[in-house]
C-alpha cells in the first residue's frame, strides 16, 4: 500500500524501494509477486527498459502460470518491440520454453513493430526492422508493405542507393495501394537522372492507372517532357495535346504544353505548326519562355521564307 501511494504521487523511486522491501521481506507471499510486477511496471513507465526487463523476467521465472506472469510477458513483448529487437523476444520465449510462437505469429509481430516505427516517422528504426524482416521472411505475408515502408523511409532519409530495389518490388506486383507512389518516385528519379526513356515508361504507366487528378497531370507532363528530351517528338506532341484537352490545368501547365508542342514541331522541321505554338507561348508568358518563344518565332518565319 505504501508503494501504491508513492505511485499515486508519481514518486516512482520511493515506490520501487517500497516494493523491493516487500519482495525481500515476504518472498513467498502473493504480495511479493505483485510487488515485483509493480517494480517492473514502474521502471517501464519511467523508460528504464533494461531494469524493467530484468524485473519482469524475474516475475515470469519465479511465478510461472500466474496472472502477473502473463502480464509480464505482454510487457516484455512491448519492450522488445520498442527497442526494435523483436527477434530477441522470440529467442527469449524459445530459450525458456514459455510458449510456441508460430512463424505466422512471428511474421505478424515483426511487421507490427516495423509499422509502429514507420507511423512515428522513425525511418532509421523502420529500415532496421525492414531489413531484418526481409532477411528472415523471404515469403512473408507482409512483403509488399515492408518494401513500401523501406522505400518511404529511404526517401525520407534522402538515401538513393538502396531505394530502387524496394520501388521495383512494389511496381512489379499487381497494381496495389502503393503503386502510384512508387511509380511517381521512380519516374521522378529517372527524369532527374536524365534517363528519359525509363522515366517516360514509368510516367506513361502511372498516367494510365492513377485515379488522382493531380498525379495524372504530373504523370502526363512528365511523360511529355521525357519523350521530348528522348527525341520522340510524335509522343511528346501527343502528350502535350492530352494536357491541353484537360479543362482544369494551371497556367504553367498550359505554357509548358504549348512550349513542348512548339519545340517538338520545330525539331521535326514543321515550322508552320511550330510558329503557331511559339506565338501562343509569347502571349501566355512574359518571362524566359516567352522571350525565347519570341526569338524562335522569328527563326520559324525566316525558315518559312
Where do the PLM segments sit?
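Acidic, polar-rich low-complexity tracts and alpha-helical solenoid repeat scaffolds
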Residues: 1-305
Amino acid at each position: 500500500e505504501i508503494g501504491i501511494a508513492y505511485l499515486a504521487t508519481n514518486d516512482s523511486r520511493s515506490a520501487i524501494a517500497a516494493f523491493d522491501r516487500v519482495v525481500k521481506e515476504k518472498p513467498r507471499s502473493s504480495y511479493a509477486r505483485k510487488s515485483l510486477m509493480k517494480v517492473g511496471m514502474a521502471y517501464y513507465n519511467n523508460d528504464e527498459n533494461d531494469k524493467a526487463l530484468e524485473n519482469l523476467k524475474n516475475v515470469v521465472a519465479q511465478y510461472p502460470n500466474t496472472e502477473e506472469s502473463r502480464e509480464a510477458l505482454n510487457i516484455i513483448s512491448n519492450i522488445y518491440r520498442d527497442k526494435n529487437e523483436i527477434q530477441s523476444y522470440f529467442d527469449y520465449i524459445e530459450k525458456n520454453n514459455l510458449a510456441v510462437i508460430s512463424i505466422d505469429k512471428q511474421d505478424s509481430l515483426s511487421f507490427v513493430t516495423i509499422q509502429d516505427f514507420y507511423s512515428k516517422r522513425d525511418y532509421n528504426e523502420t529500415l532496421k526492422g525492414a531489413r531484418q524482416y526481409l532477411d528472415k521472411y523471404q515469403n512473408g505475408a507482409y512483403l509488399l508493405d515492408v518494401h513500401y515502408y523501406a522505400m518511404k523511409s529511404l526517401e525520407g532519409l534522402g538515401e538513393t542507393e538502396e531505394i530502387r530495389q524496394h520501388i521495383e518490388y512494389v511496381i512489379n506486383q499487381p497494381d496495389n495501394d502503393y503503386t502510384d507512389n512508387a511509380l511517381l518516385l521512380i519516374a521522378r528519379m529517372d527524369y532527374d537522372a536524365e534517363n528519359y526513356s525509363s522515366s517516360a515508361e514509368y510516367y506513361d504507366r502511372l498516367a494510365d492507372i492513377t485515379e488522382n487528378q493531380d498525379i495524372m497531370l504530373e504523370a502526363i507532363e512528365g511523360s511529355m517532357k521525357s519523350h521530348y528530351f528522348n527525341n520522340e517528338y510524335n509522343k511528346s506532341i501527343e502528350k502535350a495535346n492530352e494536357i491541353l484537352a484537360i479543362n482544369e490545368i494551371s497556367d504553367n501547365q498550359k505554357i509548358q504544353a504549348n512550349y513542348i508542342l512548339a519545340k517538338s514541331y520545330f525539331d521535326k522541321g514543321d515550322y508552320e505548326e511550330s510558329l503557331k505554338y511559339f506565338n501562343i507561348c509569347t502571349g501566355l508568358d512574359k518571362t524566359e519562355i516567352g522571350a525565347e518563344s519570341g526569338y524562335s518565332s522569328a527563326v520559324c518565319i525566316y525558315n518559312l521564307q
